[in-house]
Amino acid sequence: MPLGKYYCDYCEKQFQDTPAARKRHLDGAQHHRARALWYDAVRRQELHGGGGGAPPLLHQPGAAAIGVCQHFVRTGTCKFGDSCRYFHPKPPPANPGPAPSGPVSGPMAQQSNIQGSQPNFVGYQAADGSSFSGNILGGHTSWGNLPPSLRPPPEGGYPPFPFVDWG
């Protein structure tokens, strides 16, 4: 009976799938470097909203971004470009968007007034000129990237589904 092949997605290598060969590969320095580059790229995408910064393969193997490029921070440019081994932060947006004009009403604002402190959830900022993670227009909150199952139902309810005979 022929042995199967093992394909490592991190290293893009294929080899015979035996316990000894797999252990030898998983303990190898090249696999550790490739796996670290993969997770650094994932972490970088999460930190910078997807796709910011240089792709991990433009860096030397094992040379993940080590700190912030001070020249880029001061001048806004870097002679090394995407191959710089330091991180190039994105500047904050110049106009973050309209802030709510009046007091914010709702359960989170009431909780804030009752406890005397800000509620602890991501994207919240105080109602004194800053905004929530979604835009507040006419008392309605934009729920952003929430999946449909986590969004509140529409004000008028859901439309009725057409009858389907499963007979």
From Swiss-Prot:
Database matches in InterPro entries: Matrin/U1-like-C_Znf_C2H2, U1-CZ_Znf_C2H2, Znf_C2H2_sf, Znf_CCCH, Znf_CCCH_sf
UniProt protein name: Zinc finger CCCH domain-containing protein 3
GO cellular component terms given for this protein: U12-type spliceosomal complex
PROSITE patterns referenced in this protein's UniProt entry, alphabetically: ZF_C3H1
Record-linked Gene3D superfamilies: Classic Zinc Finger, Zinc finger, CCCH-type
Compositionally biased region (Polar residues): 108-120
Molecular functions per Gene Ontology: DNA binding; zinc ion binding
UniProt feature, compositional bias: Pro residues: 89-101, 149-167
Stretch list, region Disordered: 89-167
Keywords: DNA-binding, Metal-binding, Zinc, Zinc-finger
Span of zinc fingers (C3H1-type): 63-91
Domain of life: Eukaryota
